[in-house]
Amino acid sequence: QRQMCIRDRFSAALLKICNPNIAIQRGFAVPQGFAGLVFDIGDGPFDHHAKNSPVRENGVPYAAFGLLWRELGPQLIGPVDAGRFDESFVQPLDLDDNTGCGNQLANIIAAYNPRWDGEDRPDDCFAQAVALAQDMLAHKLEGIRSVQRAAAEVNEALGRMKRRIVRLSRFAPWKQQLIPSKARFVVYPSQRGGWAAQCVNDRLTRRPKRPFPQGWAGQPPEELAKRSGIP
């Protein structure tokens, strides 16, 4: 029996996110006269086994999931973030699928393959794995949309920056806006009371543009207030 690949599960998960009512049928050949979308078989646009299947500019070959994401991703989260997500999430899965280089997420999904001596139906195992992949993918995409929604709020605070310190009225994902900016620090209300302060990293070195003094590290609130001069 055919072992299910991670590309199958995430491809199906992506399609179900785009259309929750879609009916997905596994098979080894495209039925004659079939007019629906086909991936991973059939030598069509979403079958990476086809001759001259596309390869990314960085050399990472596409698998079915990557081909579907290239088509659908920009419609879900916009072209810029779709490209970032391809690089961080989709490409490693495509690379493992094409080369067998190893990927921990692929190993987790592979745990849903039916055992060689088990009684589980392959289609049931596939459905369970797709449900996991769909839940994971949906949360990743919603996280990206959350960052997108924060952009206007963070940019507004950046416009009020003083002494390279950005003050947010509430916590919001700030890195995409502040790392490329001249901001060195960001402060916002802490869930534990008071305020939280973070250094903004440099885009190239990934180190704080201006680190806090080493002597502040690990100090209790009272001592930190004394050393920093901030009550």
Predicted regions, residues:
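A short beta-strand-loop structural module common to alpha/beta enzyme folds
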Residues: 21-32
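Active-site nucleophilic cysteine motif
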Residues: 7-10, 62-64
